[in-house]
Amino acid sequence: MASIFLNKKTIETNNFIFNDNRPKNIKIVDKIKSSTVEFFHSIQKHIQQVKVENNNNNNNNNNNSENNKYKRSQSEENINNYIQNHFNPPQPQKKRNILFIFQNLINSGNSNNNNSSNSSCNSTPSTSPSSTPRSTNSPRSTYSPRNNNNNFTESSSDNQQFDITFNMVVEKERVILTVKVPEVGLTKKILFDKVETIKDAILLVIEKLPPGCLDASEYNLFLPQKNQWCKIDSRFSKYQFKENQEIEFKKDSRGGVSHMLSNVGNLLTRPYRTIYIKLPEIVTVGTLPPLQINGQIGDLPSLNNSLNNSLNNISSSSSGGTGGGSGTTAAATGSSLSNSNSNSNLQNSQSANNSPIIHRRRTSSFSYDPNIHHSSLTHSNSNSNLISTNTSSIGNSAPSPTTLGSKPFSIPKLNLTENNLNNSSSTSSSPRNNGNEVIQSSSSTSSPRVNAPPPLEHKKSFLNIIGISPRGTNRERSSSTNSLNNSTSSLKSSNNNILQQQQQQQQHYDSAPTTPRNFGTFVRTQQLQNQQQQLQQQESIEAFDFEDDSTLGEVLNKICTRYQYIEKDLLEDYSLITKDGLWFVDRNKTITELGLKHMDEVEFKRMTQKVKVVFLNKEIVLNFNPSDTLKEINYKIIVHYLPSLIKLSRSNSILSSSSSSIFLNHQSSSSSNSSSSPSQSYRSSLSLEPLVISDLENSQILSNTPTITTVGNHQILNLQQQQNKQRSYSDASPLSFSKDYTSEISNHQQQNIENHINRRKNSISTNPLTNSGNIANNNNNNNNNKDKDDNNNNNNNNNNNNNNNNNNNNNNNNNNIASSTDTIQSNSSTGSLGSNNNIAFSIQQNRYPIPDNLVEFKDFKLHLSGTKNQNPNINQKFDMLLDERRTLSSFNFWNNIKLHFKNSSKSLHSDSKRVAPTLPFYLQIESVEQFSVSHILELEGTLLISDILKSFNRLLLNNENIKINDPLDEYGLFFNTVNNGNREGLSYGSSIYLDPYKTLSHYPMIEPLDKLMFKRTNTIFGVDPNTIVSKIDPITGFNIPCLLLDLKQKFIELDGFSIEGIFKTNNYYDLTFTEIIKEIENGTLLTSNNPNVDAIGIACFIKRWFSKLPKKICSLLDDETLLYASTQESTAEASLDSIPQPYRSLLLWLVRFLSEVSQSAYTNKCSAKILAIVIAPNLISISPNNNNNNKENNDHHHHHHHHHNSHHHRDNNNNNSNNNSSTTPTSSSVGKYTSLEKLHQCTLFLRNLIKLKLRENGFLPISTSSISISNSHNSSSFISMTGTSETSIHSSNSPISSSISRSPSLTDIVEE
């Protein structure tokens, strides 16, 4: 709704002032048949006639009141007739309102005629102070000028103003639009001021562009939101442009008659041919569109409605309503706006449900689940249209009606389909009849003869007028239609179908995607085999008209306009392929030279994938076939590239390179025997700069490579052409691989192999159970030491390894047969050898023979490593080993992904999933302080944060080298904003906690391979003491955390000093800890009387707090200092200076507290010795891997023996009721002894400090006599005076010697 303010000045000068913020005062009519401008022109014209008549009457000096009354009544009658004839208001009250306004305008014109002529035309009208806004309760209000409570006030001043509100959008005269010029690659904001027609707007845009860059006669304005062109001769205000609305300025392929005449002339005079091209769906790493489950709308990403805000910020649920400046008239906005509003309301009601929804992956324009029948997805026409049209075109970050007011959902992917990559294109699919046929609309980026005229623009096109029927691009494809159908039947297209599609189509997004995950692309249509049938029904084949002299590069550039939001270096990996598997690579050849005929069908498909391979501190940029498996790629790297890389490390010369193009022909492959020997370039580098190998046809590298190879069902023929081209770094485009570069075994080699096996058959036992073992033993004798691996070692046990593959053990150096896990295992090969044919067949299956000089690299494979912010303090870094059975496209890698080619048998790695995730997403999770481990995880993109936590916890629990003492429920994932660059929506200098109940889509700042920190989620345990709120302890004078002081005070209130076994008891419950944490966070620990909080729980809480410190207090002392501090009290006091603050203050506070507890040892049975034994394990970290070098030197049997003993020892410790420590040292015997020795020293150190504090308090006389801390419960006092020396405490007769000194019972003082 828009408010229009009129006064006498604006009417006389034809200046209408629009203000959307004014209150809506007077509602005259609901619908106006004529346009707004014509309406006001009519009002102005009629009022001008009335004013002329009144002026004539005034000049005649006719002051007769009766005459004036008659003329006034006559003017009212004329106005009444005018309104009745032109507007025909349905209600009498509206007629009276119009008459009232007209009469006041006439009266104001009569009384102020002389003053109005001298007034300024640009004065701004002021609002009457007595006006009040209209009540919103009643739908319609009547007005009368009798009091100040009405919304209209009559005045005789020049600035009198009247508010008229219409149910129609009125566009401003001044509007700023964002104009995109795709041909120039320019986006500018242009102010359109007093522009009357579209032609004037075009001339204004031409003035703002660089001079001479575009021709105004060939360009027009295009509205991507409505997918329509503007009429050149139409008024500019007709299209109701909004502020900062985005429009496109490009060549008009169907705008006017002149354009169509020129196009028809070109078609009649210049040779052309039409090519049908299948356009794939390209998905870019980012966010995924909304999902539909059983016809319902799932959780959708809620985006900010403001275009000025960041396109990456995801906001919470917002209202679906529009502001005061939006219009609702169907004639102005079309039916698409009303459809989108209804669908948006449906989504808002659906998003109110907070229950988690399992999100499924979309494979086409509608969501597909193999477990759900297809009919359930499209049972609702409104919902199916919404999902099928809008969700397939998601990719821009600007909001749309279907994404406002919804919850974030579960996928961090950005779907840039072919439908929305170009805003001028529109593709929609709607089920017809039984759902087998799908209509797809055409794109406006193709030729003008192909695209049908837009709806609501002109009913008849020029081609229909002159009798030429345009070829449409909408094909009716049945469900049984295969890709690239051989049929070239005519395409069915009609304006009615297009009009119906345009009415159902949702508004496209306005701006290009700018999410930080925009790294690369992959073809979604090649991921899962069970989705191929659904994808075949959604084929997008469009017709393009090209001139005969058009080159392949021009053809690809025209196709790439559909994917204009993807970087061009990514689109360079795409090319055309025919139905017969013919790739077109030479972009300088014309379509005539390439053999493309009229009405041919080709496919626009990805041909190569750029990968950075890191080997021996060198980077090379290679291009691989996305359909190749990792096993094939690993073999190609070893055979074709490792020789050059090894030579690079030995050569200092930089040679010139030559590149070659590939022309892959299926038909000529059977008869072609071409050979080539271009020179291969080698390039040395002492740094980590990427090396680009642009030529593969080297006689030295590809000497064993056949000319004819196979890619799937297509054969490949390599035709080398010399081209002198300079290539450098990532701008180079290395040659792509074929699927199989293997050489068949020649007849001579096959004969030698058969003769060799026949000679050895006589030495093989006839027992099939021992055949594999004998073959393995014989082959192991012939192999070199460097060729022995785990497969050969495992074959030493003949009776236990009958299932091993014999072909893997036939490593004969004379015949150059390398082991391979790709051979076929069968009964004939695992059992008796059988005939020679079986042997020959098994050997031929080994398609990846490695030369002798490269056998040492047979275990080298590709790994995915963390490349961002490497932490040198990580002890165990697990890279992800890429599964060799998966294809490169299944990993969803972006261009220039960095993969490390290294040994997979010795390095730490975690295997990738055998079954490829439907939406893979890669994260690096690191835990520094607690476990010092880092993992690269390949996760399903639909997982919650809690699922990612479970996956990482499973890796930690399965790692035998990691000792976990704490429950993993206390840990969570954090995103560190300090080391992750400048990204929008981040508060730097802190870590963002990832909510376990949310998905990755809630955190759009997380990019693939970002590092997440695995650390504690609470603010009490495991926190650095420097970051905790502290205050001065009045007793000790140290700066102590407030929570420790509150816990001690609560302990005193609960009379914890008199409870027996107060620090020895560990039978606390999780409920107690939960209640204590809750009261500490709320600050009610000292004031509440919670029955679940007792003194034993407080004591256990203090022990847990000291055990969870990031740095254990006694671990800060080196071994020599700790040994020195454990000897006597004076050395213990002197060693305190070696402990840094604030840990020294914490230790002294704890010693003071324990000394106070030990003073009541008669009642609580906790002497200084017992307290030292109980608390010491919490002050020192005991690692089970103190002697890893000794463990590695032990053989397997010896290691297993000690491993069994350690488990038996752990069971004994758990069953011992006298042990009260919190750590169990389990390792080899040497490591166990070292850990217990340090624990013993820590116990003596703590006991000496407690004794020293007791001496300071006056409980012990300062003399040469010593103290013996008794463990007997029958003694009347915990202090016994003896005349022996201080060293008598370690004698064998001492009651504590069996518990503290080194003896076989040292484990009695150790407890978890």
Curated annotation (Swiss-Prot):
Keywords: Cytoplasm, GTPase activation. InterPro entries: FERM_f0 (IPR032425), RHG17/44/SH3BP1-like (IPR047165), Rho_GTPase_activation_prot (IPR008936), RhoGAP_dom (IPR000198). SUPFAM superfamilies: GTPase activation domain, GAP. Residues 1196-1210 have a biased composition (Basic residues). Rho GTPase-activating protein involved in the signal transduction pathway. One of its GO terms (cellular component) is plasma membrane. The keyword Transmembrane does not apply. Gene3D superfamilies: Phosphatidylinositol 3-kinase Catalytic Subunit, Chain A, domain 1, Rho GTPase activation protein. Residues 147-158, 437-449, 508-518, 763-776 have a biased composition (Polar residues). One of its GO terms (molecular function) is GTPase activator activity. The gene is gacG. Its main location: cytoplasm. Residues 53-67, 111-146, 328-355, 373-397, 414-436, 479-507, 792-816, 1213-1222, 1282-1305 have a biased composition (Low complexity). The record marks 1064 as: Arginine finger. PANTHER family: 3BP-1 RELATED RHOGAP, RHO GTPASE-ACTIVATING PROTEIN 92B. One of its GO terms (biological process) is positive regulation of macropinocytosis. It is found in: Cytoplasm. Residues 52-74, 111-158, 314-519, 762-831, 1185-1230, 1282-1312 are annotated as: Disordered. Residues 1030-1212 form the Rho-GAP domain. Pfam families: FERM_f0 (PF16511), RhoGAP (PF00620). The keyword Cytoplasm applies. This is Rho GTPase-activating protein gacG.
